[in-house]
Amino acid sequence: TMPWGDLWEGTGDLFSRKWVWLIGLLIPAALLMVVRSKLKTRIDEMNKDVGYLRRDSQAHTPLSLLYTFLIAAPVPLFLVLLAAGLWVQPGTFTSVMGAAVAQIALLWLVFEVLYRLLKTNGIAQRHFRWSMEYNHQMRRRLLVTGLALIPLTFLVAFGDQWPAQLSNDRLGLVIMMASMITIMVSLPWVAQSYPGRHYSRTMRTLATALCILAPLTLIVLTGVGYYYTSVRLTGHMIYSLYLIALWIV
């Protein structure tokens, strides 16, 4: 059974005895929240400048991307600070949950950035000339994929920090199968929605096939008893998705 009591005790100790330290660490996240509206306004202004000779510049796109990362950063930054606090608490379970919360922070940052890039009249549409229809399709399908990845990040954290617990983790096995099936359905549609004008139909087909085969392989491994192996490989798959998203941007 999971020692939930240790988690609540460690979290309570973190907030009761180290609240001054937490407040100090939360100042950067609060500052980012304060300047979000100004950053959004600046991004909108630069989006309108794109395509106009006298107002456009080579710095517009990298600055817009940087501002988007800063806008998306407050919640992930808070989660990272919470994860660091849990990590230093005594007990294996609190350390595992700290690692899991850190994984959630990275997931949140990546998908919020992508979601903001793909909004109507956003950076993808104005700077990269992606069509609004493709952007809307990708946003919907990325949302499904991101939600399916949330429980998987917890499983990966347990596999990294507390592998012995996976041997009796029946609930985790069911969650693993359900999440992988969801990803196997949603991720290929994301690949199909990508408006890669410079990619041939063969490359698009290969990318779609890979998006199907990767989760399908993990489903098969889980089904035949290699649960720990599939959890470890899931971590590599998630990190690969992050790198692909960064490469696309």
Region annotations inferred by a language model:
Residues 13-249:
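Hydrophobic/aromatic interaction determinants used to assemble and anchor large protein complexes
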Residues 1-2, 249:
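Non-catalytic extracellular/periplasmic "stalk"
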Residues 2-18:
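Short, aromatic-rich amphipathic segments at membrane interfaces
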